[in-house]
Each structure stands twice: as C-alpha cells, then as structure tokens.
Amino acid sequence: MIHPETNLEVADNSGARRVQCIKVLGGSKRKTASVGDVIVVSVKEAIPRGKVKKGDVHQAVIVRTSFPVRRADGSAIRFDRNAAVLINKQQEPIGTRIFGPVVRELRGRKFMKIISLAPEVL
C-alpha cells in the first residue's frame, strides 16, 4: 500500500536511489497503490552522472511492496522494502537494468519489458 509521501527505493539503473510518491494515478479519489500501479514520484536522492537528477518528477511502476500482495491461489507475497522502477511517458523503463526480484502481477499490467529485464520473477 503506497500512499502519497511514501519513500521508495529505485530498482533500476536510471540514476535515482530514492524517490517519494507524489500522486497515485488512476482516478481522482484513489488513495493507495499496490504492485503494478503507476504513480508520480519526485527524485529525492540520485547518483552523479545519472539519467535523472534530484528534484525531477517522473512516473514509476511499483515492483515490490512491504504490504502483502494476495494471489488468486490464496498465497501472499511481501518484501522487506517498497521499490519502484522509473518509466517514461510511453510506459517503458528509463534504466536498462532491473535490480532484485519483481512480482508476476506485472505481466497482467503490460509491463513485459520490466519482467524481461528482471533477474527473478516471483
């Protein structure tokens, strides 16, 4: 469950290290986001010579949450930290590598490029 002002790790090599959620996309009354949802983020911490700078505003897709994600078979999966991947306006990742596992639910949300770059899909 990602709310506005939630801090997330960045799971790609776009240059950002930490981002903060500004807005949850998908309706004016929508308050929370889960895995596979698109949010608007502000870069709070970035590395030098990266593709993005501190203060930049981008869209991101959530790939890991500490809140459990329930599946149809009754199982649940959760992670230690919240993480997101920065995407451009065409819904493609800005970075060329993905760090850490991502969840299978991204496949249904049409983020196949992120799944193909990820080292592990849970």
Swiss-Prot record:
Source organism, top-level taxon: Bacteria
Alphabetized Pfam families for the sequence: Ribosomal_L14 (PF00238)
Single GO MF descriptor: structural constituent of ribosome
Listed InterPro entries: Ribosomal_uL14, Ribosomal_uL14_bac-type, Ribosomal_uL14_CS, Ribosomal_uL14_sf
Recorded GO CC terms: cytosolic large ribosomal subunit
Gene3D superfamilies linked: Ribosomal protein L14
GO biological process terms, semicolon-separated: translation
UniProt keyword list: Ribonucleoprotein, Ribosomal protein, RNA-binding, rRNA-binding
PANTHER family xref list: 50S/60S RIBOSOMAL PROTEIN L14/L23, LARGE RIBOSOMAL SUBUNIT PROTEIN UL14M
NCBIfam families in the cross-refs: rplN_bact (TIGR01067)
Oligomer and partners: Part of the 50S ribosomal subunit. Forms a cluster with proteins L3 and L19. In the 70S ribosome, L14 and L19 interact and together make contacts with the 16S rRNA in bridges B5 and B8.
Function text: Binds to 23S rRNA. Forms part of two intersubunit bridges in the 70S ribosome.
Stated family: Belongs to the universal ribosomal protein uL14 family.
Cited HAMAP family: Ribosomal_uL14
Name of this protein: Large ribosomal subunit protein uL14
Chain's gene name: rplN
